[in-house]
Regions:
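Extracellular calcium-associated, cysteine-rich motifs in secreted modular proteins
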Residues: 1-174
């Protein structure tokens, strides 16, 4: 007997000659079996966010989860997924205060020193913007000589500026 079923786009989406309803485990021919495919009737290459869905920029993130669906990207932190991340720290360049330094990504006080104490050029005074760099980085330096002004947690004995209003002197050892 001759089969009565005829392959048509509505019953054989991928055109492989098999009836999708009972003979084909991969209806869209995208290498993801229907049981694992979040988009079983749409050809897709995504492996992140949703498996087997459209990934226009080929970065692995399904367009529906990709904040930059037409720009290849590897960001996975904060609120920007699948966007350009030049230093590979997970933070998209647009949200990364240090886009080429993988150990730092935020600078709460905006002084150019990173908030992460474990990172390169860590800010010693995260909540207070400052220009100091000699004894501590990123703390208030009233006279601009590089040494931070003394405060309740860092005094002259620790290396703070002994002359906080005189940029020609910063220590007094006698």
């Amino acid at each position: 007997p001759r089969p009565t079923w005829i392959s048509e786009p509505t019953t054989d989406m991928d055109g492989d000659g098999c009836r999708d309803s009972d003979e084909d485990d991969n209806d869209d021919a995208d290498d993801f079996e229907d049981s694992q495919d979040n988009c079983p009737t749409t050809y897709g290459t995504s492996t992140l966010g949703r498996v087997g869905c459209t990934d226009s920029d080929l970065d692995g993130w399904a367009d529906s989860h990709d904040d930059c669906p037409v720009e290849y990207g590897n960001s996975s932190q904060n609120d920007k997924i699948g966007c350009l991340d030049s230093d590979g720290d997970g933070w998209a360049n647009v949200d990364d205060a240090f886009e080429y330094e993988p150990t730092q990504w935020t600078d709460t006080d905006g002084d150019g020193y990173g908030d992460r104490q474990e990172g390169v050029d860590a800010d010693s005074c995260v909540d207070d913007s400052g220009d100091s760099y000699a004894d501590r980085k990123g703390c208030v330096d009233s006279d601009g000589d590089g040494y931070s002004d003394p405060d309740s947690s860092w005094d002259i004995g620790d290396g703070a500026d002994a002359f906080e209003n005189d940029d020609s002197q910063w220590s007094d050892f006698d």
